[in-house]
């Protein structure tokens, strides 16, 4: 039997000081050494609406752990709000914060010898950072998120009633046809409650994917932050972590550990879900990074193969009119997985923290199945309250009926899919030798094949200026480079350029190609993650104004239509003078420079490139050798 990790600090005469400190922190003497210590990694902050309500959540989870016989020890991580950090120097810190979060959890868990972990996450880089930590540590772990916010609704001056989200406010801000009065109304109502932004943006995409990976309970990704059903989820998470902790330490059952649950097959299932629901392109970056931490040989090529086979079953904002509350009403993630299972697109023997197999838990939680549990039916009736509130589980509204329409409802079946291939596509070609990613679900059909002349910007700021000044016209391919993990550094999201294109009426006639990334709220012909990035000597560094570029999503190609010899000549010149932007002044802190020194391109998940393991580093400490799954 594996010993409790916490015995390192709770047993032995030499640990009298550690035990004294545990008593001083409120642990009863009788519990020290007798009960497992569960680290509760919270991410409460008043900066982020997706996290403002998490302060009491840590206490609820902790109380559930205590009732089940554990010792909860809560601590906090940082949480960057990408929406507030967007469009200025702050966005440079977003992706690097993922690694900082992962490292901080590792530091706390390892320094205090915790036996298990609960991750209370919600927004863009927090769930991925916690996922990296869970894969790295490989101790019993359960994820539970803060939940999505309710969708906004507003009546405009002309009497039109609109459903709103954050992206509406951003795009309408640069739409000259939108009056100041209407913009003020939109701004006031776009984000009416606490929770992660209401569409299928990065935060909600990742919270849904941890359900598919098997590390969270059903309903984690779609139950609204304001609903009382969310409180039940927190209490269940506390009980679940204690159940799997006992299975591991008392019964030597290693099948409950994160790497056993999040196997290669589970990552494949998560990617299938992502493709079916048209999730954020950022999920590709984060799943690749998490697989790397798990020691799995799961690459962009695997995602590319999956993208050609899995159909798109769901279109949620920004790809369509539905919001997360609509996905929940239609049965949530279990319903999407159920449709994929019936279509033969899932590995069904994978485990979860709450079930021995995917088949087993879908039989209970898929409300479209023949005999769903009453608990599932009740959960997916949870509806928005329609009242402005920053308070968690403050309302208990219910839908009159579920959306079980598999032909034209929020979640379709395979026979009525939006497309036969998924909502994301991996493109390759001389402009992206190692790959690029596009959210194809958000691209109008008439833009799936596009050729245009390049307008080159060497920063997001320069790209915004190009759009607002009229330099970008219909038929343009706006190339934004030196914004990759190393070149930015930090791989900024290009939400403002795409939002401004939309606001200026250019989203249907302009493509954007970048080695940076896009917000989960981006739509249109937006191709990101171009690898190798410009700072790593990728072909994108050789593009000049006026070069023709061809994008062919059906053929999965991205080409710079310039002679190979000319490309080689330009890159050779760049090598001599250095792969760096010529027209950008961007002062960098020590923290950002350190990140840039280690960051790899997006096709590797933006993970850190470390020197050979001469000191018995992470590979030795956590046994992260590559495994087949």
From Swiss-Prot:
Where does the chain bind Mg(2+)? 82, 124-125, 493
Enzyme class, top EC level, equals lyase
Any one biological process term the GO annotation gives: L-valine biosynthetic process
Pathway listed: Amino-acid biosynthesis; L-isoleucine biosynthesis; L-isoleucine from 2-oxobutanoate: step 3/4; Amino-acid biosynthesis; L-valine biosynthesis; L-valine from pyruvate: step 3/4
Xref: PANTHER family: D-XYLONATE DEHYDRATASE, D-XYLONATE DEHYDRATASE YAGF-RELATED
Q: Tell me which family the UniProt entry assigns to this protein.
A: Belongs to the IlvD/Edd family.
Instruction: Report what the protein is called.
Output: Dihydroxy-acid dehydratase 2
Q: Which organism is it from?
A: Nocardia farcinica (strain IFM 10152)
